[in-house]
Amino acid sequence: MFVEDEKDYIMRMIKQMIRALVSLILGKKFTLVELPNENKYEVSGSTLDEYLMMVDAGRINEAENAILENVDYSDKNDVAAVVKFYEYINEQEDAFLEEHGYSREEVLDGLKQVAEEAGYGSMIGLFLDAPVI
């Protein structure tokens, strides 16, 4: 049971970090922010859908490497696309992630890296230190 509780905790941390990053990127109130479901995001000419299709095909690490190599951290839309990318991975089943050599800890680490590179690292640290609800 402890392992399941830990996974739930990590998933909640990831969701909290995503909400915090999106609110910082878009400048909206933290509790009301969600990225729209329609896919208008691109990273260096590739649509977010292309990266998400790689995830669906089990090429998660390859997709992550590609999106991180191409992201312009000074472009808010690029950063939002990467956050949406990690949100999508976090929504996958544990069995799918395990089968394809990926973990929720990697999602959390990736989000932390994006926050640091985009200049939001110290602010995200505050959110991670807050209680996860």
Where are the model-predicted features located?
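Flexible helix-coil transition and linker loops at the boundaries of alpha-helical arrays
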Residues: 76-80
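N-terminal alpha-helical interaction modules that lie
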Residues: 1-75, 91-133
